[in-house]
């Protein structure tokens, strides 16, 4: 279950991009899967290639700090800060923000290049899922074609590790669609137009999840 105000983020997205009505059920399911994972103390892993790699970085940036909300440090955390570092506690409280744990798998340049050189370039994301993916985590794989080999292997390894998978693709969904727990297949076939849908979709995911954990409580 998610808050009605969280679900409203999906409605707001579709109000602006009516073609995404076809994706409504999958958009809601993606929000629910990510929220369920965070509620249990797990994390989000994100991967993609080229422009989708940049999207992976963008998503992590929105989740690990405040996006639309202030995400104030709560009283329990502040009390721990005062105990550990009393002189700096106020500074930390006033400037740090609540975080939603997220890791971009495209970031690990040393690991990715070493693994590509020594083993198999198309398995670099899968290697990271093997290494840091834990049961209850979520993998978000982005591929406009739905056929990116390294993302496919990452999703397969996610299943091995009991990590839920969400994929963000174009209309066909490619080979990723049947592999993923949730497939958001935006309604276009041209790469740049698919990417133009992907950005508002993942912004919505970040807005919705942020609201679920840092937005106003509901009766």
Language-model features: where?
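Short, glycine/polar-rich helix-capping loops at beta-to-alpha or helix-loop-helix junctions
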Residues: 167-180
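Short glycine/serine/threonine-rich phosphate/pyrophosphate-binding segments
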Residues: 53-57, 122, 147-154, 176
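Glycine-centered short loops/turns at secondary-structure junctions
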Residues: 41-42, 136, 162
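A short, well-structured juxtamembrane/interface segment
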Residues: 21-40
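Generic N-terminal amphipathic, Lys/Arg-enriched alpha-helix
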Residues: 1-21
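A charged, well-structured terminal subsegment
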Residues: 192-219
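Glycine-rich, small/polar surface segments that engage phosphate groups of diverse ligands
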Residues: 39-132
């Amino acid at each position: 279950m998610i808050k009605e105000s969280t679900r409203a983020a999906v409605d707001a997205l579709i109000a602006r991009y009516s073609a995404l009505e076809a994706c409504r059920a999958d958009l809601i399911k993606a929000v629910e899967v990510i929220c369920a994972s965070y509620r249990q103390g797990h994390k989000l892993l994100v991967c993609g290639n080229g422009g989708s790699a940049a999207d992976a970085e963008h998503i992590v940036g929105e989740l690990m700090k405040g996006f639309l909300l202030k995400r104030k440090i709560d009283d329990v955390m502040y009390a721990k800060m005062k105990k550990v570092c009393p002189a700096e506690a106020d500074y930390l409280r006033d400037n740090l923000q609540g975080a939603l744990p997220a890791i971009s798998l495209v970031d690990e340049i040393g690991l990715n290049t070493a693994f590509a050189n020594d083993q198999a370039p198309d398995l670099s994301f899968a290697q990271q899922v093997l290494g840091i993916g834990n049961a209850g985590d979520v993998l978000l794989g982005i591929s406009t074609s739905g056929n990116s080999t390294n993302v496919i292997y990452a999703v397969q390894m996610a299943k091995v590790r009991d990590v839920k998978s969400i994929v963000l693709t174009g209309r066909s969904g490619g080979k990723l669609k049947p592999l993923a727990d949730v497939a958001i297949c935006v309604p276009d076939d041209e790469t740049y137009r698919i990417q133009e849908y992907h950005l508002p979709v993942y912004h919505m995911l970040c807005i919705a999840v942020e609201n679920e954990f840092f937005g106003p409580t509901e009766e």
